[in-house]
Amino acid sequence: MGKTIGIDLGTTNSCVAVLDGGKARVIENGEGDRTTPSVVAFTDDGEILVGSPAKRQAVTNPNKTLFAIKRLIGRRFQDEEVQRDIGIMPYKIVKADNGDAWVEIDGDKKAPPQISAEVLKKMKKTAEEFLGEKVTDAVITVPAYFNDAQRQATKDAGKIAGLNVKRIINEPTAAALAYGMDKKSGDNVIAVYDLGGGTFDISIIEIDEVEGEHTFEVLATNGDTHLGGEDFDNRLINYLVEQFQKDQGMDLRKDPLAMQRLKEAAEKAKIELSSAQQTEVNLPYITADNAGPKHMAIKVTRAKLESLVEDLIKKSLEPLKQALADADLSVSDIQDIIMVGGQTRMPKVQAAVTDFFGKEPRRDVNPDEAVAVGAAVQAGVLQGDVKDVLLLDVCPLSLGIETMGGVMTKLIEKNTTIPTKESQTFSTAEDNQSAVTIHVIQGERKRAGDNKSLGQFNLEGIRAAARGVPQIEVTFDIDADGILHVSAKDKDTGKEQKITIKASSGLDESEVDKMVKDAEAHAEEDKKFEEMVQARNQADGLVHATRNQLKEVGDALSQEDKDAIEKACEELEQASKDGDKEAIDAKSQALMEASQKLMEAAQQQQAQQGAEGAAGGEQQSSKADDDVVDAEFEEVKDDDKK
């Protein structure tokens, strides 16, 4: 049975870990890094780049370099957060036929799960190279506050990447697992403050320890799926754009190339200001006008950055208060605070959390790796390799149906431990009603229309009767991934209708299957591309070695033979440029055949040099022997030594 890997699919960076000898190990990618940028780029020649190679070329290819795609996953195009991102992102965000937010590359529309699948494929390959075996099973993490549509879209991304997603778990819960594995005794109530690249979560988790077995029970969770490091970056970018406009009278927002350079510089400056009090954003030749090139050189202090993002930090404290209230706990009940996500390295964020809880957060959990480590632990639990851990997660938002008067009637309250199943009996609103529409919604508002619509279906064939007489049992069943299954049953006729909520947006099964096939086709293309590169490299090496031999022993050949070899070299070079692997192989073979006499001449020369070397060595040896004088030894008795 193959290993199950744990993947933290992040907004900014992703990470993969596996249980190795009972301990979770973070795996380095092909570039030697423990985290991989969640960046996917499409080049002009059709190549797909993922991770650092994609990030490095972003400045020269801003419209086709996709980052922070997690902010779009499972979202509708008209969502306020998506509309806000459209004005910031250099790539094109478009409305799909089903109303989802997709991206467009060279006129080709792509769903966010397709893009996330490229990052997951990279994680899968990283794990396979380390383990030396094929990997198909994975546990993938999502923000605790992800709704049903976002969780389903993440599962779709895993399927497109060729992974069997055994479990979707919440990021703060995963971080708690990573932390709890080292804490071997006693009960504990912890708060996990997770501020990542694009999402924010707070979870209150109780860890109970009984005879070495740990139960992780999530008491409450809250958050904002559109608050993270990207928003902090954007505040700094806007400030720099405004300062430049004041100084130079030019708006950089109209120049995608300049904005991409500015994004990189802002991210770097933000990171530097976590350890320094001041930094300078220095971008020569950022743009140009009729008067010539323009340069940016703007000093930014830590205090300035803090003032730009102060409201974002405050915004993260509201869910903390709500989560504590939902868990029926006070600040003094929290024994430990874990901070997860790269943005928690900012001193002002750490200070705000310290002030809120009245104690310092723990520093021994790596904020970039903890979530992947926890996912690997959960993978070990599912595989049976970890016996003493039980994870009890919760659904982040209330679930219910729309009832008469446009009211939301809740069947499952938020922060209910999952998996769970709840049933409630409803009736008809009118006399002789033969069908009912079950409209499934998620959220905390009383008015159904103010909540997130997850989908709807009809139960037909209800027997004619006065209003209020038919009995329709609606059942909500949430699985361990937090994905909802709904059924409605007419108790009188026994007729039943079931759906797995895919949200009114989302990808249907046929779309996912098509994307899986596309991904498999790409895998074949990638393999061919690798083989082509290998063939080209071998061809270049062969041409280089042949020409070197021509220089060294070419005099031993006739001019006709030399011309034939040079012609074969040129033909192989041309085949290499044309990029036809079969032609490269054929021309390589032709060059080897044409060079037969050249190789023989080279071997003869080597043999001659070897023979001359050996003869010279013997001569030296005999001369050396003539100069040797036999030594005369005299035995010295012990008595003579004294």
Curated annotation (Swiss-Prot):
Key words, A-Z: ATP-binding, Chaperone, Nucleotide-binding, Phosphoprotein, Stress response
Region (Disordered): 570-642
Regulation: induction: By stress conditions e.g. heat shock.
Residue stretches of biased makeup (Basic and acidic residues): 570-585
Ranges of biased composition (kind: Low complexity): 600-620
InterPro entries: ATPase_NBD, Chaperone_DnaK, Heat_shock_70_CS, HSP70_C_sf, HSP70_peptide-bd_sf, Hsp_70_fam
Coiled coil: none
Compositionally biased intervals (Acidic residues): 627-642
The keyword Manganese is annotated on this UniProt entry: no
Modified residues (Phosphothreonine): T199
Keyword Cell membrane: no
Tree of life domain: Bacteria
Molecular function per GO: ATP binding; ATP-dependent protein folding chaperone; unfolded protein binding
Family note: Belongs to the heat shock protein 70 family.
UniProt xrefs under PANTHER family: HEAT SHOCK PROTEIN 70KDA
Primary role: Acts as a chaperone.
Name of the protein this chain belongs to: Chaperone protein DnaK
